[in-house]
Amino acid sequence: FTGIGRRLEELGTINGITVIDDYANHPTAFKANLQAVKEKYPERRIWAVIEPHTFSRPKATLSDYPAAFRLAHQVIISKIFASRETDPGNFTGADIAAATPRARYIPEFSDIATYFKQHAQPGDVILVMGSGDSHKLSRQILSTL
């Protein structure tokens, strides 16, 4: 038994950079995951990457995002995974980034992977969280490093 997939699942380490994938999809879980990863890797920079789940949930919990990501070196926010919702056209990942210190909105997965190729350093930990397609992003980052 090696653990449960998508729950702080360490996918691998390439060039000294560790990529972790998790199913978390709300600020309480983001914060708990960052605390756990920081406990395991106290001296390493931790990058948090989220694929927000639905439009309504992050909009309703927007005020919780700054505290949730307090332990992150930087936060990368992708486009929102709509799931069962229709895009209302008045809320995006850019709104989350604007409300979150040290956050950057990079909507496309391929651009996020390229960003890490250029900015991640040996010793860094990249924690990717979301319940939509973020598992694909985790693997894309790992293969791009």
Label for each model-derived stretch:
Residues F1-L145:
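ATP-dependent carboxylate-amine ligase
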